[in-house]
Regions:
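Conserved anion/nucleotide-ligand pocket segment
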Residues: 84-156
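Short acidic catalytic loops
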Residues: 27-36, 62-65
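ATP/pyrophosphate-binding catalytic subdomain of soluble kinases
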Residues: 132-203
């Protein structure tokens, strides 16, 4: 870091697992990241891998708890099959798991049977039914493609399309809020999606042209997802 002179390591990609050099750089690890509340968002596994490394090396860890921006009352979606573990799925949690990052740390400690010295600094003023915009906290994008709270709400339902040949909206101004492809008929998809009667959500036909990622530079057709009622949305 140019201001402090502190060495900065990247705990992602090839170094998502802490190296010995990284572990030798500290005695206590402070974890302070804003998660989005979805099982396949990578910060959950950055947390877990850090905990495993500290457990192995005998290091202490402090987690600064942060609210779950999409609320702490609802859970939903499928539970991970352990046969498909990866960096975007390593714990048997539902898609929307309803925990704060501090609660997730305690869950991971118990799930992985870790014995590390873990301290969670608790939240203040948050109630489980609160979404981020029920607080006075600003939305600070936890990653470039999760730019709004609505994107986080849509993400729990649309991120699955990353594993298909459909665009999940990366390379547009509405990542995870739009899905589509050059070969999709937006009007037909709109009718079929709304015909499912899914609670709390409406689908509107749209077209978009990703500037990067899947179908870069190609006009795609599909739907935009509008969450109308968070309480019934599932």
């Amino acid at each position: 870091d140019p201001e402090t002179g502190v060495t900065v390591f990247t705990a992602f990609g090839e170094t998502s697992r802490f190296t010995d050099e990284m572990l030798d750089a500290f005695d206590v690890l402070v974890f302070d990241l804003q998660d989005v509340g979805a099982r396949f968002y990578t910060y959950l596994y950055s947390l877990g891998y850090a905990m495993e490394a500290c457990n192995r090396a005998g290091k202490s860890m402090v987690v600064l708890d942060r609210l779950n921006p999409i609320g702490g009352l609802k859970t939903g979606g499928t539970v991970l099959n352990p046969a498909f573990k990866s960096f975007v799925g390593d714990y048997e949690l539902p898609t929307q798991y309803g925990l704060t990052i501090g609660e997730a740390a305690r869950y991971i400690r118990d799930y992985q049977k870790l014995t590390l010295d873990l301290t969670v600094i608790p939240l203040e003023g948050w109630e489980r039914g609160m979404y981020l915009d029920d607080t006075d906290l600003p939305w600070v994008a936890p990653s470039p493609n999760c730019a709004t709270l609505n994107a986080a709400l849509c993400y729990i339902g649309t991120c699955v399309f990353e594993g298909t040949n459909l665009s999940e909206g990366r390379g547009t101004t509405l990542p995870f809020e739009v899905i589509g492809a050059p070969f999709i008929n937006g009007a037909v998809l709109e009718k079929k999606m709304n015909g499912l009667g899914l609670p709390g959500v409406h689908f509107r036909r749209t077209s978009f042209c990703p500037t990067f990622s899947k179908h870069q530079g190609v006009l795609c057709h599909g739907v935009q997802m509008h969450v109308l009622d968070r309480e019934t949305y599932d």
